[in-house]
């Protein structure tokens, strides 16, 4: 196993699985939790994440294929997607490429939300532009855009939760891509609105504004 990333909740390994390049995601023990509680939580989250990845694929969102789930060892074996994280690509693109990519991201989020799936951790680190060998017919022959890391995802019919998803992405853009954040977010919303419908999108965006107002108020109220 080759460790490629250590995370707060899980470690990622690159591994050959039955002749295929695969990612193994292994949830790590939290020593501050009681052992029996920790086991239950890790088992549940392992199975839940695999289920949510499957549900996202059913919704038409490209995600890694899940090959195997081992709840007793808290691992998911899934497809390795050769490519680059959008975080590493976004600012090196020309304006048209960046606008197009942002529009596509909005469309993917809309597909999730139409199926009542909330990602819970929308950042440019959790989007992978696959290498050109993986073509997306819907995007004019461009590489496929994959959404990963469904560890915090859940089902919800609430507008508020959709607003939180978009707010998290907006915050991630401002944090990691300040120079192009406004432009990118605008085109994310364009793609989202086109895919989910203008009327519904405006309700979700109203929630985003509410969330931002609450955040500003909380900051002002802090002594």
Task: Give names to the regions the model predicted.
Residues 2-47:
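ATP-binding glycine-rich loop module of kinase domains
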Residues 15-18, 79-80, 131:
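Active-site beta-strand termini and strand-to-loop segments that position acidic
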Residues 43-45, 57, 61-105:
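Conserved structural core of kinase catalytic domains
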Residues 56, 108-112:
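Conserved hydrophobic alpha-helix
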Residues 114-124:
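Catalytic-loop of the protein kinase fold
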